[in-house]
Amino acid sequence: MNILLFGKTGQVGWELQRALAPLGNLIALDVHSTDYCGDFSNPEGVAETVKKIRPDVIVNAAAHTAVDKAESEPNFAQLLNATCVEAIAKAANEVGAWVIHYSTDYVFPGNGDTPWLETDATAPLNVYGETKLAGEKALQEHCAKHLIFRTSWVYAGKGNNFAKTMLRLAKEREELAVINDQFGAPTGAELLADCTAHAIRVAANKPEVAGLYHLVAGGTTTWHDYAALVFEEARRAGINLALNKLNAVPTTAYPTPARRPHNSRLNTEKFQQNFALVLPDWQVGVKRMLNELFTTTAI
């Protein structure tokens, strides 16, 4: 199996390099690649890459994910999240390749308290959500052999993440205020990559699984409770924190250019049934990431 990966250096892309390697021959690209074009600001170049390589599977982990920045550069977000996805979809259809693509809960209006189903009506709150929805539609229209995984609250051990930011602040400050009215499931890039590799194997033998899926870790939390778990684990590991008070505040306490959904819960039953997988509780992955952080780096 020949696999083409776009966005190899992002949170999910980095883990995909590991998870996809046993499936076959992997060509991994990013914006700086020189052998082939992996620059999503150049849709024609990216489409040409697909036609040259003629892969069996394309995994797209590249995107414009700066949610607030997208509000001030909607055309650039549209180019990366929709126009380029359409170019890939058309080229993939031409060469007979599968396309695996990641989307977001931001395609929904973010109200209510019920986990969103794949069949629920979309109504994005911001530019990022609008462009990601446009990318989904382009892929669905132009390439039948696709898997779209909507995910949420993605983190990775590599690079910056919410937990590391909270730990840094908790060492500097005695009091912190964290949002407690946004609900979701922190989902590890490791989990996304491993589930993707498994799904590709299933799709190769059962093409009828093509379609749209929700893919997040199990359970639900808030940013406030997520932070509380991080601090609890840090103290258990013997890390000294200056923090002695963690306040819960509403989203309105931190105004941002892009509106944020209150309800980022996603129903994953369809994914678990079709791919015969179990999605572990969010705490499993977060605790593992923290354990690695505490034992391998001077934080």
Swiss-Prot record:
It holds the Pfam family RmlD_sub_bind. InterPro entries: dTDP_dehydrorham_reduct, NAD(P)-bd_dom_sf, RmlD-like-bd. DTDP-beta-L-rhamnose binds at residues 104-105, 153. Binds 1 Mg(2+) ion per monomer. GO terms for molecular function: dTDP-4-dehydrorhamnose reductase activity; metal ion binding. NADH binds at residues 10-12, 30, 39-40, 63-65, 128, 132. It catalyses: dTDP-beta-L-rhamnose + NADP(+) = dTDP-4-dehydro-beta-L-rhamnose + NADPH + H(+). Its cofactor is Mg(2+). SUPFAM superfamilies: NAD(P)-binding Rossmann-fold domains (SSF51735). It comes from the Bacteria. The active site is at 128 (proton donor/acceptor). NADPH binds at residues 11-12, 39-40, 63-65, 102, 128, 132. Pathway: Carbohydrate biosynthesis; dTDP-L-rhamnose biosynthesis; Bacterial outer membrane biogenesis; LPS O-antigen biosynthesis. GO terms for biological process: dTDP-rhamnose biosynthetic process; lipopolysaccharide biosynthetic process; O antigen biosynthetic process; polysaccharide biosynthetic process. Involved in the biosynthesis of the dTDP-L-rhamnose which is an important component of lipopolysaccharide (LPS). Catalyzes the reduction of dTDP-6-deoxy-L-lyxo-4-hexulose to yield dTDP-L-rhamnose. RmlD uses NADH and NADPH nearly equally well. Belongs to the dTDP-4-dehydrorhamnose reductase family. This is dTDP-4-dehydrorhamnose reductase.
